[in-house]
Amino acid sequence: MDSTPAPMAAGVAPTSTTVTPSGTPSASPGTPAAPAVPAVAQDLKLTQYVDPMIGTDQVPPLVPDIANTAPEDLLGGFTTPAATMPAGMVQWGPDTPSVPNTWSPPGYHYSQTSITGFSLTHLSGVGCSAGGALPVFPTVAGQSGPAAFKHANETARPGYYGVTFDNGIRTELSATLRSGIARFVWPAGQRGQLNLAAKTNAASWGGSIAQDPNDPQALSGSMTGGSFCSSGQTYKIYFYARVDQPFTAKLGSGSAQLTFASSSGAPSTVNMKVGISYVSVKNAKDNLAGESGTQTFDQVAAQADATWNQALNAIQVTGGSAGNLKKFYTALYHVLLAPSVFSDANGDYLTMGGKTANAGKDRIHYTTFSSWDTYRSLMPLMAWLKPAAAGDMMQSLVDDAGTCGGAFPKWVEGNTSSDVMPGDNVPILVAQSYLYGATGFDAKKALSIMLDTASGAVTACKGVTALPGLAEYQKYGYLPADAFIQVDSSHSGGTASTTLEYATTDYAISRFAQALGDTVNAAKLLARSANWKNVINPAAPGSNGATLPRLSDRNSDGNWVANSFDEIEGNVEQYTWMVPFDIPGLMGVLGGDAAVVPRLDTFNAYLNAGSKSPHLWIGNEPAFATPWLYNWTSRPDKTQALVRRILDEQFTTAASGLPGNDDEGATSGWFVWAALGLYPEIPAVPGFTLTSPLFPHATIRLGNGKTLAIDTDHPGSIYVKNAALNGAPLTGTWIDFAQVSNGGAITFGLGDTPSAWGKSQAAR
């Protein structure tokens, strides 16, 4: 929790320690001894545990009695096995046909058995058309795609992707930050051919390809990208490509066909390098030269592996099963894919206004902000592990607001702002980042943007309204259903759940303002965050004619909408629990411990129920905080059991191993936190609610150079018997960020049956 107490309950459970007169915590009997805080350990070989195929297939079907689902519910993880770097601008990977008879965005789908090409840009885990820049397809004269393949002939690992088509043509891909490298091999006696198309998944028109007049083995051009989730906003992607073998070229309108000489006695190999830029062909060429240079394919792939291994060593977990190690490091890999680099090697980038700017010395401008999703899990982790990069990310958003109309953008892809999901969620990202240690950005300017948007002084970014219905929200204290407010580009309903989103943002801004010393606005927005109470119907219809308090849509006259059920990607029962910033207040409204615990038990009977069932849907972000709510009741052991069930059952090592869209690492971020036994439950209140860790030991290398060790005494057990921080007992289920921001040691004593740990009212 921030150092200045909030005027109302923040929803955190205080921790208890025994403190000696000198102020040094001391251990008590029955508490596991704290290990010495370790020195920075040597790097482990961690890329071996990453499987980029996890999440590339559809979510397994729901159980029959809750299978009345919406199409969204069975969407896959939508991850990509593309070769890329942490935060890479280039993600060079395979594309397949879409999945028949179901919605599936362009990209790679594990269930498909053919590949249409290898494009240089992808987004990981999103459910809208994106990426697909400059697809390259290796073939031979007289043949066209797609090409059949088998997964047995396919390999994906960090920074590398390889596949052999059934026709014998082999493709290998790797990447630097802003460029890609490919190695194509044709069977002996075949004349290899590469087909290139200057297009993206946003548009198949408007592209151009030309040979470099000064280098007959080089090509350059551009194509139109953007229009993410049908935003209509577009941009240009520029490329410069070079192959290491001579070719004859057939250039068309936005296409190129390169034909190479055959080799009669041995397979023929062509290496191709491509740099991209959102500014110019020259910058694309410079990106390629500066990052790839004269390196061979194997050298680039080795460097990518080394870079990924270093990034993954930010968290070292040991002692777990091979399956759990694979799940953990694949999740951490997915977390590190975005936000992604948008500025060139020289610092140039394309502003939201369409002009060229420069990020400045030693700074990077970022894009790919899935804000509605990632504020709940990814951004606190990024700020804790990589505060300098997270600071650049937040400065990127501040700069974006300055060139797009004054408000923060929403879903940022390239230099576009898409109106995909409801709420003004970037303020939560910014507040989370700052309060978890990423302070290297213009925080005062960020607060000014937040306050101007919250008051209505500024309203939009690139024509996308930040807070639709703000006037009604200010007047009524909620968004009235009969005002028919278009809360985002896809929804005109969901006013009750969107009210919760607005209140969450109000709370986050209030905590950010408090941290910056603006106590007046902190108090105002803290008071406004209590608007969540205005959409809790105290007598909503329940089963067997009974009533119960539950989220409901409400009209402007104050009356509740009859049979209120559907909300934004969820329903009223699922959203009733989404008040993470005032959990004690929510518990009180819902009837206290005696009412909440059995209701949560019923709610959690199913773990991934979809949007049409009044149960937990862990595959979608509004549910991320719900499994931890037992920690604010007399039964924290139920959080321990529930979180472990989710880790074991809903996340697997299969291609279908994610419970829903990964949304640029949001779902994977939840797994990382839960496996460590921590979760940043309360937006903009830095700290963690606790559960039993998945691994016997973890070492977290913090961004400030310190380390935090997390240890358990009985690996495999679920229930917490006792816990300690630096040897001092923890009797509660919450620790403040300040207690671990400079490292230390958390130890858990675990058992196979529930204990009394954390159950008392004082521990919450």
Question: How should these model regions be labeled?
Answer:
Residues 2-39:
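Ser/Thr-rich, Pro/Gly/Ala-heavy low-complexity intrinsically disordered linkers and tails
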Residues 505:
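ATP-dependent phospho-/nucleotidyl transfer catalytic cores
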Residues 719:
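Extracellular attachment/recognition segments
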